[in-house]
């Protein structure tokens, strides 16, 4: 039996009695954001809107982005990345479960010294993948050029955020490279591994 999104009591400032709100809205009020699905346009726009709103509300208090994502689309992910860099508050990133593909990109995008992985988390990086099936030759070439541009963007961000040389990051992106939390820390994708 589906229960929907759990509801929790929340008292707005100035209210005498709490009202019931869905748990995510309550957590957003505490500046806790969640990426627990594939990265695509809807979740990207939702996270961007919440980050912008909360940064307008208080530009000095950190935001916390919890990530458990198998990855997803590159452009919506880059939009989240750009917003994380644009908003004034630091965005702390926390990997719980899996941060793969675009999930690992966003994990690495957190504020320097404020990127954390839970002890049993897994992180995976790889090169962006295109959807060329059924494409005409001309479309295929244009898609390939765009894919190469996107790969260059992702690679350079990983280099900047990890502190690793270009050749190391490029080599790791050639295939699916899975890492434990401590390996991700050694690779420069997170700064801390939580102690259980």
From Swiss-Prot:
<comment type="subunit">
    <text>Component of the chloroplastic Clp protease core complex.</text>
</comment>
<comment type="function">
    <text>Cleaves peptides in various proteins in a process that requires ATP hydrolysis. Has a chymotrypsin-like activity. Plays a major role in the degradation of misfolded proteins.</text>
</comment>
<dbReference type="InterPro" id="IPR023562">
    <property type="entry name" value="ClpP/TepA"/>
</dbReference>
<dbReference type="Pfam" id="PF00574">
    <property type="entry name" value="CLP_protease"/>
</dbReference>
<keyword id="KW-0378">Hydrolase</keyword>
<dbReference type="GO" id="GO:0009570">
    <property type="term" value="C:chloroplast stroma"/>
</dbReference>
<dbReference type="InterPro" id="IPR018215">
    <property type="entry name" value="ClpP_Ser_AS"/>
</dbReference>
<dbReference type="InterPro" id="IPR029045">
    <property type="entry name" value="ClpP/crotonase-like_dom_sf"/>
</dbReference>
<keyword id="KW-0645">Protease</keyword>
<feature type="active site" description="Nucleophile">
    <location>
        <position position="101"/>
    </location>
</feature>
<feature type="active site">
    <location>
        <position position="126"/>
    </location>
</feature>
<dbReference type="InterPro" id="IPR001907">
    <property type="entry name" value="ClpP"/>
</dbReference>
<dbReference type="GO" id="GO:0006508">
    <property type="term" value="P:proteolysis"/>
</dbReference>
<dbReference type="GO" id="GO:0004252">
    <property type="term" value="F:serine-type endopeptidase activity"/>
</dbReference>
<dbReference type="GO" id="GO:0004176">
    <property type="term" value="F:ATP-dependent peptidase activity"/>
</dbReference>
<keyword id="KW-0720">Serine protease</keyword>
<comment type="similarity">
    <text>Belongs to the peptidase S14 family.</text>
</comment>
<keyword id="KW-0934">Plastid</keyword>
<protein>
    <recommendedName>
        <fullName>ATP-dependent Clp protease proteolytic subunit</fullName>
        <ecNumber>3.4.21.92</ecNumber>
    </recommendedName>
</protein>
<keyword id="KW-0150">Chloroplast</keyword>
<dbReference type="InterPro" id="IPR033135">
    <property type="entry name" value="ClpP_His_AS"/>
</dbReference>
